[in-house]
UniProtKB/Swiss-Prot annotation:
One of its GO terms (cellular component) is molybdopterin synthase complex. This is Molybdopterin synthase catalytic subunit. PANTHER family: MOLYBDOPTERIN SYNTHASE RELATED. Residues 25-37 have a biased composition (Low complexity). Pfam families: MoaE. One of its GO terms (biological process) is Mo-molybdopterin cofactor biosynthetic process. Changing G74D: In cnxH89; impairs molybdopterin biosynthesis. Residues 1-37 are annotated as: Disordered.
Length: 195
């Protein structure tokens, strides 16, 4: 992925102009809470500038029919490729991202027989040690829940319109797509990344 272009002279925003709604933190969280299928499986999808709550995520997917509830928190590490990280910053195309999250969660319900799906992604600055994504799923049994949660996470990183800027302690920064690396942190080859 190429770096984002630098603003052209004269294109800077006037501080008194309002931000577009997709960049204005006061218009968030952007949420979609809905159900899937004839049995009304609960789906909660969220983009937010606020701290993520694991408890809230588990409350959304827990049910009497769920014998297994899986929770994943993705947190900001203090290094990336041996460079000390100051923070991450995320941006998104919210309307498209929520549409993608809805499609992914609906696919997961069908594919793994899940009883509930909760996906929340932070936007803006996320300091070291704080969560940038939470995925929670409920299912009748642990096998479906484990596989479903991992599948949801990997597909979210691959498909959803959220971009990450890594800001380093030395002052440098890099824009990245989440799909550039696999679940073990290894760079994907072009062949692996062709979709």
């Amino acid at each position: 992925m190429s770096a984002r272009p630098e603003p052209q002279p004269g294109s800077e925003r006037n501080a008194t102009e309002p931000l577009p709604s997709h960049l204005d933190p006061t218009t968030y969280p952007r949420t979609l809470t809905t159900t899937h299928g004839p049995t009304s499986i609960p789906l909660h999808l969220e983009l937010t500038y606020h701290t993520l709550s694991p408890t809230t995520a588990l409350q959304h997917v827990s049910s009497p029919s769920s014998g297994a509830n899986i929770l994943f928190l993705g947190t900001t590490r203090d290094t990336f490729d041996d460079r000390p990280v100051a923070r991450l910053s995320y941006t998104s195309y919210p309307a498209l991202a929520l549409k993608s999250l809805h499609k992914i969660s609906s696919e997961a319900v069908e594919k793994f027989g899940l009883n509930g799906v909760y996906i929340a992604h932070r936007l803006g600055e996320v300091p070291v040690g704080e969560a940038s994504i939470v995925v929670a799923v409920g299912a009748g049994h642990r096998g479906e829940a484990w596989r479903g949660a991992e599948w949801v996470l990997e597909v979210v990183k691959e498909r959803v319109e959220v971009w990450k800027r890594e800001e380093f302690v030395d002052g440098g920064m890099e824009w990245r797509e989440n799909r550039e690396r696999d679940g073990f942190g290894k760079l994907k080859t072009k062949k692996e990344d062709s979709r």
